[in-house]
């Protein structure tokens, strides 16, 4: 439970967790990231998000797939970050990546159906198919996207461009700079 962590870190990476925090806890989550991040640290938050205005969670998904989950909009995430000492050093919206990912997950699910049916009933199989197809469509039609937020306390903690990502060895140097 991230709320029980007291140690500070120079790097924090959160992948696919924010969606499970729930809307009522967005500000609490970012306050905790702020508290856990050292003054010269960098946090990377990877989350699914609404690419348009804030929207409620599907009642079906809330009931059957992710109870209490919430897909935030970028405006909601930004508002929560603004209430901390952190600033968004970089924001990237991965537009076309997650739809094909969900399609591959669905293909793998279908290929594994004999094993799945040993563990789950037909109701689960139908619900999971529906979930994967609906989410794939949401990404393909750009209702949802994936956001990468790079957060920091200090401007000097992060490079001024993304060039380091594409230079051999430089990415590793950045990742291990604090060691």
Segments (PLM) and residue ranges:
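A short acidic, Gly/Pro-enriched loop at the edge of an enzyme's catalytic core
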Residues: 2-13
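A short His-aromatic
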Residues: 4, 20-21
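Ligand-binding pocket scaffold of soluble enzyme catalytic domains
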Residues: 12-13, 33, 136-139
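Residues lining the SAM
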Residues: 15-19
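Serine-hydrolase catalytic core recognition
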Residues: 26-29, 45-47, 53
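A short glycine-rich, Lys/Arg-flanked "PGG" loop and its adjoining helix->strand segment in the class I
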Residues: 27-42
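Substrate-binding/catalytic lobe of Class I Rossmann-like enzymes that use SAM or dcSAM, i.e.
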Residues: 48-159, 173-174
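Short, cationic low-complexity segments
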Residues: 163-179
């Amino acid at each position: 439970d991230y709320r029980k962590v007291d140690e500070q870190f120079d790097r924090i990476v959160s992948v696919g967790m924010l969606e499970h925090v729930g809307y009522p806890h967005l500000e609490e989550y970012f306050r905790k990231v702020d508290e856990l991040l050292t003054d010269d640290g960098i946090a990377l938050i990877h989350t699914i998000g609404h690419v348009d205005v804030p929207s409620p969670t599907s009642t079906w998904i809330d009931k059957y797939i992710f109870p209490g989950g919430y897909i935030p909009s970028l405006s909601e995430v930004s508002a929560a970050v603004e209430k901390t000492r952190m600033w968004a050093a970089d924001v990237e919206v991965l537009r076309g990546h997650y739809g094909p990912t969900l399609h591959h997950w669905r293909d793998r699910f279908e290929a594994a159906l004999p094993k799945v049916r040993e563990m789950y009933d037909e109701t689960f199989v139908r619900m999971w198919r529906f979930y994967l197809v609906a989410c794939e469509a949401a990404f393909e039609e750009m209702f949802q996207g994936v956001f990468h937020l790079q957060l920091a306390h200090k401007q000097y903690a992060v490079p001024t461009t993304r060039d380091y990502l594409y230079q051999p060895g430089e990415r590793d140097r950045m990742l291990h700079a604090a060691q």
